[in-house]
Amino acid sequence: HIHVVKRGDTLSSIAAMHDALPAFVAADNGLTLSTPLVIGQALVVRTPKTLHTVRAGETLSSIARDYDLSVRTLLRRNFFLHGRELLREGDVLAIDYADEAPLGTLGVNAYAYPYIGGELLDSVLPYLTYLTPFTYGITPAGVLAPLDDARLLERAARYGAKSLMHLSTLTPEGNFSSENAAALLQNDRAQSALLAEILQTMAKKGYYGLDVDFEYVPPELREDYAAFVCRLREALNAEGKPV
């Protein structure tokens, strides 16, 4: 349901109107229970069909098993958990929701810097198909710039999101380099070296696929860039990895 706030509405009154829980309405809309509402504000309100009150000794895994669900699905249906798997006795979980038939499938990718906060990362991972650590830069000679992506890859695997390796021309100064792109695209030996290192890195770290992000490529090199991406795709597809 979409509820438009009227004068006198509170989270509690809105939740009661839709047979929902105030804490769920708050979490699903990025609010806290003490956040003041504004007249005309639109809120998403979901009506739980089945609720489960956590008992002593229960875990997210045990509850998911009891209802024949995956932990990932249970986390998705309880955004207020923000991805945390540690439950407290008395927590109320939504097992399913009324009138929520699947509409289809959707693939969702998110980019993350290595320094992203753990709480924010864990809160979104249950909803992601892919997580892409940002970013592996390159030198003109076709050498990958290192990326401290171990934590991101570990969290992605824990929450069932596939990891994509991000290849770009971003420099340590934070700018996309046309010069680095041009040097690489006109040097077959550098491309071969880069391709070999990409394959090695993906195999070592367990990356699912590759995301190529070269920005500000000179117009006269557009065909060289297309050929380079085709070369990457051919080599990685042979290893079962998408580009």
Where are these regions (language model features)?
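Solvent-exposed, polar/charged alpha-helical surfaces in well-ordered, non-transmembrane soluble domains
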Residues: 12-16, 23, 61-65, 72, ...
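Short, structured interface segments
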Residues: 29-47, 86-98
